[in-house]
Amino acid sequence: MVLVDTGVWIDFLAGRSTPEVSLVVSLLEEKETISYTGQILQELMQGCSDENDAKTIEVHFEPFIELFPQRSSYRLAAKIYRDCRKQGYTIRSSVDCLIAACAIENNCQVHHKDRDFKFIEKVCGLKILRK
């Protein structure tokens, strides 16, 4: 299962041609199981200019698996943040720590374009999709 992060979805939905978008297209064509968190959906929907665009995004995400943070996810997210900080990496968004925690707990690879996930991988063993 692959968790696709917000930045990649933004480029995908905008029709941009990037290596990350090409990989999402391949994942969809290969019928790979794709997941997301509510935080990712929220970030995408809050960037919409109107309710119709937000609803369109919701509909696009219906076939994917939503990962729900558990109590343990929040604890792990806090630990991820602390562990990264101890190693000299300040994660810019605690949301990224929560997304990483959900991915770790659900044994997902993360497909991203955000440097914070590289730091989390280095310190905490987050699985990053590479193809």
Residue ranges and their predicted role:
Residues M1, A100, I104-K131:
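Acidic, PIN/NYN-like endoribonuclease modules and their adjacent C-terminal/linker elements
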Residues D5, T37, R92-S93, D114, ...:
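Histidine- and aromatic-rich ligand-binding microenvironments
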Residues D5-T6, L44, A77, A103:
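Generic structural signal for small/hydrophobic residues in well-ordered secondary structure
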Residues V21, T37, L41, A54-I57, ...:
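A general structural signal for well-ordered alpha-helical segments in protein cores
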Residues E51-K55, C84-R85, K127-K131:
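Short, hinge-like loop/turn segments at secondary-structure boundaries
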Residues E66-H111:
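Active-site neighborhoods of divalent-metal-dependent phosphate/nucleic-acid chemistry enzymes
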